[in-house]
Amino acid sequence: MLVIPPGLSEEEEALQKKFNKLKKKKKALLALKKQSSSSTASQGGVKRSLSEQPVVDTATATEQAKQLVKSGAISAIKAETKNSGFKRSRTLEGKLKDPEKGPVPTFQPFQRSVSADDDLQESSRRPQRKSLYESFVSSSDRLRELGPDGEEAEGPGAGDGPPRSFDWGYEERGGARSSASPPRSRSRDRSRERNRDRDRDRDRERDRERDRDRDRDRERDRDRDRDRDRDRERDREGPFRRSDSFPERRAPRKGNTLYVYGEDMTPTLLRGAFSPFGNIIDLSMDPPRNCAFVTYEKMESADQAVAELNGTQVESVQLKVSIARKQPMLDAATGKSVWGSLAVQNSPKGCHRDKRTQIVYSDDVYKENLVDGF
């Protein structure tokens, strides 16, 4: 079972109010329509009455008018006597008749009536415009022109005529047109603008120079970075690359000492690999750096060893062979100096082999002593 509430809900009440408003509006519209229809009907009746009258010609109308004038029913229209000449406005005629009186108040449709008090209020509200003299001449120039007592300083031309007024345009004096000369402040403003333009140009030039200097510094930094990267690459590739860098510019090295680079090298491996090319005077190794120095008796044998062994693999060891940058004792190696040969033999990079003979004890001696003791 549906339960219907006794009262109306809020929505129903709102709808009922709207319906009542619409009813009122409909009644008002019907009343307006009736009024408009009655007015149109009255206008139509007037038009019909006018149209029903017979059409009269101008000649018959004039004759009827003359008869009426003769009978005295209509008074004749008197023609005004007008002076021949140009037409004048009524306001001007009123001014000529009564010059003491002000202008005759006439109705002007496009101008609202304004009283004198309203004019004063509006003039006080409006921002007063500066005169041409005030707009072109600054306050400092005016103070210079005024004297110590606030009066105009007497100078050449002061008091000779009316005060100076900067009236732009053309003035008719004695039939000739003369334009007023521009004030001094214009020339000052122009000079100031020129100075400002010069300062701006100087600032722009300075900014351009700074930008150029920055670009140069950046180029230098880039060149330095490139050089550093090249040096790092050479260091990574090893001393062989560093020793043989720029082969076109430098003359080929000469010497009898070779620089050998390779991992896990041993003296026996080096002697076996380099002895077939000539007599080896000295062989020194630097295990932490994985390099060794081999000195031949002759330079020809060193050149032959570089040509044959550079980049080859001996007993699973990759060898890089080149002429050493430092050739410490060329004369000693070639045998021209006695003292040089001794220095090479006893140098820190020379031969480190111990010349003493190694004493080897057999196990039988210890066994015999043990047997005799017990």
From Swiss-Prot:
Low complexity composition-biased segments: 30-43
Keywords: ADP-ribosylation, Chromosome, Coiled coil, Isopeptide bond, Nucleus, Phosphoprotein, Repeat, Repressor, RNA-binding, Transcription, Transcription regulation, Ubl conjugation
Domain notes: The RRM domain interacts with RNA, and is essential for NELF complex function. It is however not required for the NELF complex formation.
Protein name: Negative elongation factor E
Composition bias type Basic and acidic residues, residue spans: 90-101, 186-250
GO aspect biological process, one term: negative regulation of transcription elongation by RNA polymerase II
Span list, region Disordered: 30-58, 79-252
Intrachain disulfide bonds: none
Ranges for region 27 X 2 AA approximate tandem repeats of R-[DSNE]: 184-237
